[in-house]
Every structure is written in structure tokens, then in C-alpha cells.
Amino acid sequence: MAFDLADRLQTPVFVVTDLDMGMNDWVVDELEWDDSRKFDRGKVLDFEALEKMEEKFGRYHDVDGDGICYRTYPGAHPSKGAYFTRGTSHDEYARYSEDGEINATNLRRLVQKFKTASELVPDPEIILSDKKNCSGVIYYGSTSAAMIEARDMLKEEGIELDLMRVKAFPFNLDVWDFIEKHDYVYVVEQNRDSQMRTLLMAEGGISAEKLRSLVWFNGQPIEANFIAKKIREREPEKI
């Protein structure tokens, strides 16, 4: 998927894991290779497509409204599809320009491209409890196993939780919808600075009061007992 996204969005895609996953043994499903799998190269104009084009090819021209422009491979056509651009401001046809409005148009296109990316990245994994009006929890990475165990522990005590495991950034609409449906949400992180919480506040305009930080950073894998204890201590507040 990372390769497909990189080609479709024409941008680097980072696959990030945490230290626990990188240094310890984990039990996972056996890898199954599919020889019939084809890579999604995204919006590419080949020889036939360039031959049929009546309009001029614009390397930075957003014809579909999703912020992603069509591209060509070197040598795809003897006279069409080639372009030369520079690192400074340019127009939709890769021509150098110092026009402020042209530069602003390019930047607005990139904003739309970022929104499109949020629709293509993996959806979060959401686990809802049977109880309504319960608290929400956001987590990611190797926190998953401890979080599920902590959820089960708290459920036995009558504390129900809705869970959401974030899998990608930029965040899609499911992330914002989950937060919106809860009065407050715990953000469980193995990160001293609670960077996921900060990112959620910055990207979604979420208030600091709504996102409750729960961090673990002693160098060891996070423990279910720790998560359960911290949530148990704060649940009676019921803001």
C-alpha cells in the first residue's frame, strides 16, 4: 500500500514503526505473496494517452479537482509530455513565474491534495463498546496489545471504553467523527511529549481539555496495568 500511495499521491510515504516492534519478537500472520498483484502507479500518461491529448500537457494542472496532477515517464513520447521545471515558483505548465496569484493557486492545490491523501490512507481501527456515552481512547502502534488488555480489565469493573487505533496521517474523517462523538478522549502514547495529541489538536482544532494525555516513556513496553490505572483515576471526573 505504501508504494501505491507514493505513486498515486506523487509524494514520499513513510512507513513508521516504534522501538518495541523493531527490537522484539512479535507473533504475526504469515506473509502471503500474491504474484497477480499489480502496483497502482497513479495518474500516468503513456504514449497512447499523450497521442490522444488535444490540449497542452500541464504537469501541475489539476484537471480532476483532487489536487493530484497527471505525470509522464521519461521517453514516453518523442514530442509530448516532456517538461522542465525549477525549484522556484512555476505555473501549471511548469513555466517559471513570479506571479503571486499563480503561486497561491499552486499552494491551494497542495492543500486539496493533502485532503485527498486523507481519503486514501488506511482507515483507523475502531472498536465500540455496547454502552453509550462512554469515554473514547486513541492509541497507535505497539500500544495496541496493552490497550486491548486494559480495556478488558476496566470492562470487568464496569468502565466501558470506545477504542480507536490510528493507522495513518493525514487523519481521515473517521478520526474526527470519533472524537466528535465523545465528550473527551484519552490519547495513549509511548511518547514523552504527547505528539499524537498535539498533532490532533493542530490538525483538527480540538481543544486541549477534550484530549486527555496518557503517556508512558520509561523505555519499556507500555503496560496494561498502567493504562487501566490512569483511566480509572480520571473516569469519575466525567467532564
Where are these predicted regions, by residue range?
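Flexible, low-complexity linker and terminal segments
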Residues: 3-239
